[in-house]
Structure formats: structure tokens, C-alpha cells
């Protein structure tokens, strides 16, 4: 949440479709990221790109911060949670959860859809895939085969391919 709170337009590269994570905002104070591994470039999906274009049209000339109030001051995630997030969850009849948990949802959905685990780890600011598999893989049923059949199919396919050359 501190990365979102501290996101500034100078760190949004529309041309390369990247969000550069360089600073965080904690209690209205800009700070460097928690760890050197947290400094990263996040790839913008088409939906994120489109949403940020719309946000830029709405607030780009108003503030250096991507997410700001009418005065141009950065939004505080606590205020957004209280005024928007939790009421929206109640309205939709969903179980209450912290906005930060959307991070877990994203990781789980990326894994379930077959995205490259190294790419996911980089997007999330992990320096290795270890944390990714430790925390998130348990939420994805049948993420990996446990009987060796995938390797066997690969070998059979490879050997059959060699016969035809």
C-alpha cells in the first residue's frame, strides 16, 4: 500500500508500459523502498495501462501523485479503505478483507493462469521465486503434477520427434 500511496507520475512510463517502484509514502513522508529488491519495474497489463491513462487525464495536471485528493495531496490508504474499499465490499456482499490481500489474489490468479513464476516474483518485488511458491502455490489446486507423467510425456514426445528426422 505504501508503494501505491507514493506512486508519482514521474515513475509511470506509458511508452515502455512500466511502473517504476522507487519510493513509498508512509504517513505523508516519501521514503526509499523497504529493501533494494523492492526497487523494480512493474509491467503494465492493458487493463492497468488503460486505467492509468484515465487516471492521468483526471489528475495528471493536478498533482505529482497518481492517486490524490481534490487538493492534489496523496491519498492515504486508510482513508480510502474506510470510505471506499470496505463499503464496496459490503455493497457487493463480499467478505471483509484488507486491500493488501488483493496482492495475494493477484499472485494466486497469475499462478493459476500459468504465468511465469519468475515474472510474478519480479512484479511483486521478490528477488526469488521461493516466497512465491511458499506462500501462494498452496492456493492453486493442481499447480504441478506429482506423478512424473508430465516429464514422461515430454520424453516420449522428444523421442518420437527424433525418429522422424
Where do the language-model regions lie?
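A short, basic/aromatic helix-end/turn motif that makes direct DNA contacts
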Residues: 6-12, 121-127, 137
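Short, basic (Lys/Arg/His-rich) helix/loop patches that form interaction surfaces
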Residues: 42, 50, 56-75, 82-122, ...
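Key DNA-contact positions within bacterial/archaeal DNA-binding proteins
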Residues: 2, 118, 130
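Catalytic-site neighborhood detector that most strongly recognizes the C-terminal catalytic loop/helix
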Residues: 25, 124-150
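Short, charged phosphate-coordinating catalytic segments
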Residues: 1-20, 25
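Generic alpha-helical secondary structure signal
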Residues: 16, 20, 51, 79-87, ...
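Structural detector for helix-capping/boundary residues
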Residues: 2, 7-10, 83, 105, ...
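C-terminal secondary-structure termini that scaffold catalytic or DNA-interacting sites
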Residues: 16, 27-50, 54, 58, ...
Amino acid at each position: 500500500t505504501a508503494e501505491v500511496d507514493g506512486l508519482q507520475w514521474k515513475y509511470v512510463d506509458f511508452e515502455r508500459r512500466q511502473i517504476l517502484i522507487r519510493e513509498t509514502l508512509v504517513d505523508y513522508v516519501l521514503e526509499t523502498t523497504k529493501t533494494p529488491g523492492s526497487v523494480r519495474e512493474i509491467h503494465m497489463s492493458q487493463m492497468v495501462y488503460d486505467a492509468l491513462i484515465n487516471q492521468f487525464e483526471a489528475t495528471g495536471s493536478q498533482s505529482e501523485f497518481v492517486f490524490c485528493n481534490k487538493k492534489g495531496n496523496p491519498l492515504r490508504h486508510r482513508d480510502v479503505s474506510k470510505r471506499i474499499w470496505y463499503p464496496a465490499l459490503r455493497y457487493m456482499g463480499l467478505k471483509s478483507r484488507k486491500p493488501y490481500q488483493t496482492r495475494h489474489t493477484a499472485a494466486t490468479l497469475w499462478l493459476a493462469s500459468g504465468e511465469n513464476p519468475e515474472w510474478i516474483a519480479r512484479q511483486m518485488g521478490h528477488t526469488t521465486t521461493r516466497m512465491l511458491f511458499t506462500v501462494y502455490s498452496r492456493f492453486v489446486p493442481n499447480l504441478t503434477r506429482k506423478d512424473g507423467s508430465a516429464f514422461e510425456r515430454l520424453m516420449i514426445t522428444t523421442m518420437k520427434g527424433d525418429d522422424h528426422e
